[in-house]
A protein has these predicted regions:
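Short non-catalytic regulatory patches outside canonical folded cores
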Residues: 229-232
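Charged, non-catalytic interaction/linker regions at domain boundaries
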Residues: 1-219, 223, 227
Length: 232
């Protein structure tokens, strides 16, 4: 029987409204689709409950889910990351526009909110594993203490934060792109561009912000548009 499998946690994203297609979803940690998995893997629930902000306030991470019966083409890290990227770019330009019009910063304006947490639950080991370019590690859930990013304010993500027509169009293209092993160049280019745009949408720096930091992000935006205009 097919089930929903948690792939990554997103502790910077306080999800109040799920984003779902047949193969994948981003949901709040209280979503009923997690119940069957948590019954089989109670250690995962423990992991989910061990997140706070830097001052100890409890945080409920967003969860990216994958359907166990999804075609293999949807199970690659590229497909998962592209799903995250399309959501981020359906939110950030829209929220930056709202922030400009209404003269406020209380909006999700940076893609750091959509970052995947590097430690994940491993069903075989019943432990946490981390596999990044910098480290490959395994550790106990018992001693884990997860935190949100200290450079981000606590903001809730809801359906009103999304440019819905853009999101629906990108979800349709995502299913076309990853529904085949031989995608069209235009579909490959779109999601390469979105990935570059997601990088360009990160905070340019923390407390060490300079004009160099801003210039770096501008360069990434230029690359995102160049990818789209390339003919292949």
């Amino acid at each position: 029987m097919a089930e929903w499998i948690p792939v990554f946690l997103m502790p910077n994203l306080r999800v109040a409204h799920d984003i779902t297609v047949d193969e994948m979803a981003i949901v709040p940690s209280t979503d009923e689709r997690l119940q069957a998995y948590e019954t089989k893997h109670p250690q995962f629930r423990q992991f989910l409950q061990k997140f706070t902000d830097p001052f100890g306030a409890r945080v409920s991470p967003g969860v990216l889910l994958l359907r166990s019966d999804a075609p293999e083409t949807f199970k690659s890290i590229e497909a998962v990351s592209s799903f995250r990227d399309l959501l981020a770019l359906s939110v950030i330009p829209f929220q930056r526009a709202k922030g400009t019009v209404h003269d406020g910063s209380h909006h999700i304006q940076y893609s750091d909110y959509f970052d995947f947490y590097p430690w994940v639950y491993h069903e075989g080991h019943k432990h946490l594993v981390c596999n990044t370019p910098a480290q490959v590690s395994l550790h106990e859930i018992r001693v884990f203490r997860g935190q949100t990013s200290p450079i981000l304010s606590a903001l809730e993500f809801d359906h009103i934060d999304v440019d819905s027509p853009l999101l629906n169009a990108l979800l349709q293209r995502w299913r076309i792109r990853y529904g085949t092993k031989r995608p069209q160049w235009s579909d490959r280019a779109l999601f390469r561009s979105l990935n570059m745009a997601a990088a360009a949408s990160k905070m340019p720096a923390g407390v060490d912000l300079t004009t160099f930091s801003l210039g770096r992000n501008i360069g990434l935006w230029v690359s995102a548009f160049e990818i789209l205009t390339h003919t292949g």
